[in-house]
């Protein structure tokens, strides 16, 4: 267990693993390029999770761009620039890099098959998950969208139903996402920020966990 772990990336993986080491006794510093953590989720959830994790002892450096990582003996030095353009440094025993994932398509022979990829290396598909090669379909982590097992499973079912002559449909807004920190964070549907951007009328409702009997009984009232 490292004494000090520097996490580059305040997304799902970085926070999940960072919070594990935090509970194991490490000092954890999260360095994030965006101005909030879990940027793909609702802003209210992001603020609440950051507040809870900060209370647990996790440190956050937001709007900070990492430019270099160097091994220095038994420690690792991270060089970055903050939102003021000033150079800042962080030193820890280990660095966890979690700045996103890319589709793993190496060795699939897509070039030989003539299957087209987009600018991010993902397989291009239409609404039926069909590639530009009519008899080849793609699902899961190699196409656009969240890299989630239950999303891939739903897409596999859709393709099977299409091949069986049916006309299925996936509503991606109904696919939930979960961050397994403590406490956990979950979301489904459009975020408040997305609704604002799209000009959709909406109402906001909040219910504090501390008002829930089970939460009070278990002593877990954050959220």
PLM segments and residue spans:
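Thr-Gly-centered strand-to-loop micro-motif
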Residues: 8, 15, 39-40, 118-120, ...
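FAD-site-proximal beta/loop scaffold in flavoenzymes
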Residues: 1-3, 89-163, 169
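Glycine/Thr-rich phosphate-binding loops of Rossmann-like dinucleotide-binding domains
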Residues: 15-16, 21, 105-107, 119, ...
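A Rossmann-like FAD-binding core segment of flavoenzymes
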Residues: 24-127, 190, 197, 201-203, ...
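Rossmann-like NAD(P)H-binding beta-loop-alpha module
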Residues: 1-36, 40-41, 148
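Mid-to-C-terminal Rossmann-like scaffold of FAD/NAD(P)H-dependent oxidoreductases
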Residues: 42-44, 55, 66-68, 104, ...
């Amino acid at each position: 267990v490292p004494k000090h772990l520097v996490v580059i990336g305040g997304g799902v993986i970085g926070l999940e693993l960072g919070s594990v080491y935090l509970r194991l006794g490490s000092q954890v510093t999260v360095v994030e390029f965006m101005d909030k953590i879990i940027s793909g989720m609702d802003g209210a959830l992001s603020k609440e999770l950051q507040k809870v994790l900060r209370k647990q002892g996790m440190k956050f450096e937001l709007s900070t761009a990492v430019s270099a990582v160097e091994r220095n003996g038994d420690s690792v030095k991270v060089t970055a620039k903050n939102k003021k353009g000033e150079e800042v440094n962080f030193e820890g025993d280990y660095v966890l890099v979690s700045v996103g994932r890319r589709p793993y398509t190496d060795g699939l022979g897509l070039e030989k098959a003539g299957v087209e990829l987009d600018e991010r290396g993902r397989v291009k598909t239409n609404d039926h998950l069909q590639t530009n090669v009519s008899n080849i379909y793609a699902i899961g982590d190699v196409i656009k969208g969240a890299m989630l097992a239950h999303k891939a499973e739903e897409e596999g079912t859709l393709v099977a139903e299409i091949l069986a002559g049916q006309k299925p449909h996936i509503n991606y807004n109904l696919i939930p996402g979960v961050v397994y920190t403590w406490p956990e964070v979950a979301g489904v549907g459009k975020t408040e920020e997305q609704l604002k951007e799209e000009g959709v009328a909406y109402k906001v409702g909040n219910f504090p966990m501390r008002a829930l009997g089970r939460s009070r009984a278990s002593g877990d009232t954050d959220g």
